[in-house]
Amino acid sequence: KRSGMGTRKPTDVNKKRAPARCDSHAAAVTGALSQSSNISPLPLAADLRSADNRDCPSRTDVLGAALANVVGGPVGRHALIGRTRLMTPLRVMFAIALVFLALGWSTKAACLQSTGTGPGDQRVANWDNQRAYYQLCYSDTVPLYGAELLSQGKFPYKSSWIETDSNGTPQLRYDGQIAVRYMEYPVLTGIYQYLSMAIAKTYTALSKVAPLPVVAEVVMFFNVAAFGLALAWLTTVWATSGLAGRRIWDAALVAASPLVIFQIFTNFDALATGLATSGLLAWARRRPVLAGVLIGLGSAAKLYPLLFLYPLLLLGIRAGRLNALARTMAAAAATWLLVNLPVMLLFPRGWSEFFRLNTRRGDDMDSLYNVVKSFTGWRGFDPTLGFWEPPLVLNTVVTLLFVLCCAAIAYIALTAPHRPRVAQLTFLTVASFLLVNKVWSPQFSLWLVPLAVLALPHRRILLAWMTIDALVWVPRMYYLYGNPSRSLPEQWFTTTVLLRDIAVMVLCGLVVWQIYRPGRDLVRTGGPGALPACGGVDDPVGGVFANAADAPPGRLPSWLRPRLGDEHARERTPDAGRDRTFSGQHRA
């Protein structure tokens, strides 16, 4: 009942279709059917319910209209929206996502070729001649299988190894100690890798006694991990479609994101993305404890879902509704602690490796700081560091910049004439974190995909950013490629990084612009032809904040209270619900 394609309903061909009247729509249509003037050539359907307020891209978006012409044309003006039982929007988006996930696996396939003979545990991936770079198939999953001792069946966080140089000589830290390493991932991601390894080793054992195809164990490990990551991304698509409200088709951008092709199987970030987006869905459905559990699980896989709590806190202060948020935070903290506590107590040195590694990392090659260094010759904030010596100045600068960004977001959230949507503030928070952070690994961009779709559902703008972001992968790989005659200079790579960062900044600017002009927000407006009686949509992700009046605490200073005099915040033009990027004249 959620399809945008619908079923044609018979009606008087000489009359215009009666407009929707929200809850009274079905009754009004039924009354009209009883009139003797109806000359429908066929008997009318008994049930004429239709989700007429749903956004149909074939009617409102030039890109959607063009794609609709490929598969049979736009939605008809007499269609019953949301009545198709088979090809519902969610199933269509699942099919699209499976295609892009298959493309994502195919981009890594060249790195899954193996060498050696014998059983699977005696074969290794063939990465000779830097294949991973010139064939653009690099994935952390393959080298981590051996580097983090998973190939030996050892438990993460318990087992360690000594860091060596290219000659096999043990590395010494800046303080003279031997560099000892442990698994560098949060606990849930580490356990996921361990379970994937166990399944891969089980298959290897079975292939020795049963007539099964012999597959290199590291390749089977990748395939098992990729299967779970694909399910996690499908979960992200499902949760985004539930959060999109009447704009359910916006979630198709998550399913068909160009970033999926290159980054979905580069690392394990899809686990956290699926859990975090599901947590937002639970919040939207006013289940704060479940939201906290899912956000806590996401944070146990990757820390970034914890950032979701900050926008909720700001909106809770503005609306004066902190009870539900307190339950969410308590559930998130309890869940995170429940997952981490056993490893924290049994293997404290291994558990803390994730935090220790992030403290001592310098500015990553994808960061804005490295972009400046590549064009100016600047040596960075900490130019003379020993091996594994923490960059104290860089860490301080990154922290201060993010605090300033959070302060700006707080000011916007508390003073905007109309309360911002949860997705808008969450996108601004995560995007700010990535922009000022010293590390922006390529797969981190997956964090932004569902948030950007929910915060700024302008399809062509989002596709432009996603395409730029996805293409960063190509010069990155060829910059790392060590063949002087075929590799690219650093500036080619850092230029694309700069373009990516500018694109994200533009998205942030557009989100802020729409916060101060909610009449231009495609989510909040009722859509093309919507009636004032139907009202708009306050916030599909808002949960307890949706349609709530502002009630900030009395001790909040006046300069942090909503600015109610801004007339721009109340503008609602007749076509405000129409995508401004749509320049055509197509109408259903």
Where does each model-flagged region fall?
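Aromatic/glycine/proline-enriched transmembrane-helix motif characteristic
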Residues: 365-435, 517-571, 575-587
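Specific aromatic-rich, kink-prone transmembrane helix
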Residues: 272-288
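Perimembrane helix-loop-helix junctions
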Residues: 307-337, 341, 345
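Short acidic/glycine- and proline-prone juxtamembrane loop motifs at membrane-interface regions
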Residues: 264-272
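Transmembrane-helix signature of polytopic, membrane-embedded enzymes
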Residues: 237-257, 419-420
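Start-transfer (signal-anchor) and selected internal transmembrane alpha helices
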Residues: 4-8, 15-121, 127, 222, ...
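Membrane-interface alpha helices of multi-pass inner-membrane proteins
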Residues: 259-263, 279-280, 289-314, 429-435
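Transmembrane-helix motifs of polytopic, lipid-linked glycan transferases
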Residues: 215-247, 276, 404-412
